[in-house]
Amino acid sequence: MVSVKVFKPRSGQDAVRNKRWACSLSPRCASRLDVSANDHVRIEDGKKALCCRVREIHEKDKYPLRVSEKTRDNTGLEHHAEVSVRKQIPGKSYMKARRTGDLAETVWDDLKQSQILIYAPHGGDTEFGTDDAAIRLYRKLQNSGFDCSLWALHGFNPNSFARWHVSKPGLTLGCYPGLDQVSDRTYELVVSFHVQSKGYTGIGGAIDDSFRKCVVEEMDSRIRDRYEFRWRHNDMRWKGV
């Protein structure tokens, strides 16, 4: 952990300036934290915690931490605030995170199976219901005799989307201990749960069209009167690939 002051992005620092959940670190600060570009960092100002994606390592050590204006505005993090920064993002157990508005991590894994991974990176209040859906699927598969693992994050607090909805945790190394554990092997199938502000449910991903179509047909046969399901990538804004 390092203690630093928050600075604005410099002029022309497009990788950080207009992005949410974005920051950059000086070479010295990055070295002390042992982080690289695309890693995540946890920032605490004494009242709250939030997560940022390190978009780049900038040049001057005089400015150890630069945080985008969108991130500061959305989370109430002040320019020139004194903060502590660390590499490990999850802060507390699930129940304590829920009580205090923090972030927790869940991993259920036998350290060896490579058949199925269930993945919910924005659970809790961040994308409400996604971790619950992931856990239900995990238990259903386990009870049906399938080997599977689960990794999920649970962010809490009414402002959890602004504080914890950071993109691409899968590109990080050492930021989420549970994710590091399940990332040490290749799976036959990975199922990821997300929420979108659209009027349909998209079955996306890199798996072939016939598989996605089969999933949509099965879901449609069960609850066709309540939801619209789509499987063609061209019909979805977020394709998940």
Which residue stretches match the model-derived regions?
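Autoprocessing Asn-cyclization modules and mimics
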Residues: 1-32
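Small-residue-enriched segments and motifs
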Residues: 4, 49-53
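Short, surface-exposed loop/turn motifs at beta-strand boundaries within globular domains
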Residues: 16-18, 34-36, 111-113
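Serine-hydrolase catalytic machinery in alpha/beta-hydrolase-like enzymes
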Residues: 27-33, 44-46, 147
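N-terminal catalytic or cofactor-binding beta/alpha core of small enzyme domains
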Residues: 27-28, 53-60, 64-241
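Short conserved beta-strand and strand-loop elements enriched in small hydrophobics
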Residues: 36-48, 81-87
